[in-house]
Amino acid sequence: MAEFDYIIIGGGSAGSVLADKLSADGRHNVLLIEAGPSDRRFWVRAPIGYGMLFHDQRVNWMYDGVPEDELGGRSVYHPRGRVLGGSSSINALVYHRGQAGDYDDWQAAGNPGWGYEDVSTVFDSFEHPHPDQNPVCQTGQKAGQKTRDPVNKAAGNAASRSHLSVTDNSAECHPFGATFTSICNEAQVPSSTTPYREGEGVSSYLMTTRNGMRCSSAVAFLWPAMKRANLAVRTNASVRRIAFEAGRAVSVTFRYKGAETVLRARREIILSAGAIGTPQILQLSGVGDGASLQKLGLDVVQNQPAVGQNLQDHFGINYLFKANRPTLNDVFGSWPGRLSAGLRYVLTRRGPLSLSINQYGGLVRTRPDQTRADCQLYMNPLSYHSFHDGRRRLMRPDPFSGFIIGFNSCRPASLGSVTITSPDAEVQPRIHGNYLDHQQDLDDAVRMARFVQRLQEAPALKAVLAEDPMTPLADMDDAAVIDDFRERGSTVFHLCGTCRMGPDRRDAVVDPQLRVHGIGGLRIVDASVFPNITSANTNAPTIMLAHKAAQMILADAG
């Protein structure tokens, strides 16, 4: 039986980083197992491909949740990357660290070393502005104030090639963005023409692009590492289970090229299969709620009821507006517009195809007495209607000039779960978001809708409307706002927390070093270990977490 020092399950945002860092010095043999294919595909590399990949089963797990009681029986669609780079290869490219308090809360929950003072230097080590641009705004700073550039100074050496390009695309964003800035200014919302990478403020979003192409975790970290002789990558390889001996994880069984293969790990097995895949694989391997596993005929390796619990996600809503001037609808909604944008992109790697449709937004406080931002805004110069289950026709915008203002609560309180229903690894697990189960989330929805109402009443917004708002919040009482939120609200695709980090195995799956409680040789490194969801998009903190985990793993290796 072949052996590796480290076996990494999942080649996504975290797994790509681990494959790079653990193989970098040549001392360790590393295997990366990815269920999906290579990411070397046009629609994966082109930023606008986000809309094409939203329902592409070749690179997308396309999970469906169970009917949600608080959503009137609606189920929620969960796209997740099934390709090298994982969800960083199919997401909307927005890069945001969140808020310092998110990580301080991690530390306060019994996880020393995970406070913002500790992790900010990790972020600095891999973020790289591309091309060299104005420094980005940080918490507590005013627009135009000088800031630290991300640390990545050795431009000529091999290490410098292993960085994440975090790009200010404001020059390429649709000119409708000036209207969004005016709306925020009139509503007294902190805003800047310089993008924020953390904390409070509205601006154009930073994006993970490089030279007009998506810079996923695979592009940034895995591609440079794949030339190394001590790194093996298996794509289209579906993990079935992890095997244990004497309380230690020792091997991985996976299906590859039509046959089951078993490979052993001399040092560690690292689960990086994401907030859905990681608890699924643990449960299939006999680690989870013992009674539930026995009912499925599975041998219980360790009774760990916390596996698959504590599912957290951002849940939001969009408000659509008809505009009296051109938006991206006019580009993507006509053949001349699409052809012109396509030709420009092919020739120059610029224009609307070179960036996300999520172009503007940020974190805001919906009440001035709050100590931190509680709401994330999205202000998109494009509008589209969603289906009842949340699926979107992103490449077929509404047949009129339109735009969107949407929001989600930064730190929702409802907790869901991910549990297997079959011993067959090919059967998707049961995903229960449990959205809006907590009263806080309903209160947040009303408060944030009233905040958007303030934006609706700004003269700058009224000046660009072709007709009254499609959702006239001023005419809706709180009950109507909540009914609308239940009817149309949807995930923002930031699932996390299903194998949370913490000191007590009764409610946590891994310790602060990301080692699975009670089992040797097994760590979890992905968004499933988040003790609490971060305030913004989760790709940035997941990549940070993987860098910090690699430091821990290598330190233990000596």
Task: Please name every model-derived segment.
Residues 1-124, 304, 314-323:
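N-terminal glycine-rich phosphate/pyrophosphate-binding loop and immediately adjacent elements
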Residues 70, 108-140, 144-249, 255, ...:
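Conserved redox-cofactor binding core of oxidoreductases
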Residues 27-29, 36-39, 122, 242, ...:
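Glycine-rich loop(s) and the adjacent beta-strand/alpha-helix scaffold that form part
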Residues 8, 12-17, 171-172, 275-276, ...:
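Residue-level detector of alpha-helix initiation sites
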Residues 49, 206-209, 234-248, 376-391, ...:
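A glycine-rich dinucleotide-binding beta-alpha-beta segment and adjacent secondary-structure elements
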Residues 451-457, 547-558:
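Internal hydrophobic alpha-helix adjacent to the cofactor/substrate pocket in enzyme cavities
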Residues 533-551:
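A conserved FAD-binding loop/helix module that cradles the flavin
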Residues 133, 148, 320-445, 491-497, ...:
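FAD cofactor-binding and catalytic pocket of flavoenzymes
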